[in-house]
Amino acid sequence: DAVEPVATELQHVQLMLGAKWYGTYLGSYKTPAREDDPRPLPKNFYHAQQDWLEARQSGKPWSWSALRPHGVWGFSTGSAMNLLTGIACYGAISKELGLPLRWPGNTGFFGRLYQFIDVDLLARAMMWTATTPAAANNAFNITNGDLFRWQDVWPRIGDFFDMPIADPQPIAISAQMDDKSALWEGMVERHGLQPYALEQIVNWRYLDMALNNDIDQMSSLTKIFQAGWTEVWDSEATITRQLQKLRDNKIIP
C-alpha cells in the first residue's frame, strides 16, 4: 500500500519465508520438503504472507519471489535466533570451565540430517531470484545445498576450540547458562573480547528449542536448481569459517 503509489518503476518484491512453511515446528514432516507439498494444519503466517503478495501482484508489471531457507547462520550480535553463535559461546564457556565439549541437545538429533544456509549465500540467492526471469513469481527452498549430521561436525568444533570431545549430555542449556554472566564478564576481560554481556550475544532458550527435536530436517533444492541456480557451499567448512570470524572479531576467545 505504501510502496506502489510512489515506486512507479517497481520491478520486484522479495519475500523471506522459511522451512516453517512445511510445519517443522509441529514435529515430523515429509522430507525432503518440496515447494508444492501440501500445507500443514494449522496454517501459519508464512502462508498468509505469500498468499497476500501473490494476489496483490496479479495483473501488475512487477514480479515477486519467495525464499524458504532453513537455519540462517552468519556473523551477528544481538540475534535471538543464531544457533551457531550460541554453540560457539557454549563451547567457549565449557573450555573456560575446563570441561570437554559435550553435545548438549537431544541425543537422537545428534545423528539426524540437518541443513542451513550461510547468510552471505542467502544474500546472493536473493539477488539471483530478484533478477532472474525464470525465478519470477515463484517460491524456492534454499540452503547451502548439502546436508550434515551434528555427530560428524562436532569433532571439528572441538578441534576449533582445542577441546576433547566427550559423550553427549542432554541438558536444559538455558538453566545451566543463566548463572554464567559473571564468568563471561571475566572472559571478556582476560581475553580482550568485545564488551558485550552474554545475554546480548546469545538466547539460550532458542538453543533449548533448536537442539531438542529428533527429526531429519531436509529441503529439496530441485526446483531452484532447475531454474538455473548453481551455487553450493560446504557446510562443514562454513561452520569453521563462521567460528573463526567470531574469534577474529573478538566475540569469542
Give, region by region, the residue ranges found by the protein language model.
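A structural motif corresponding to the C-terminal end of an alpha-helix
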Residues: 2-11, 49-63, 227
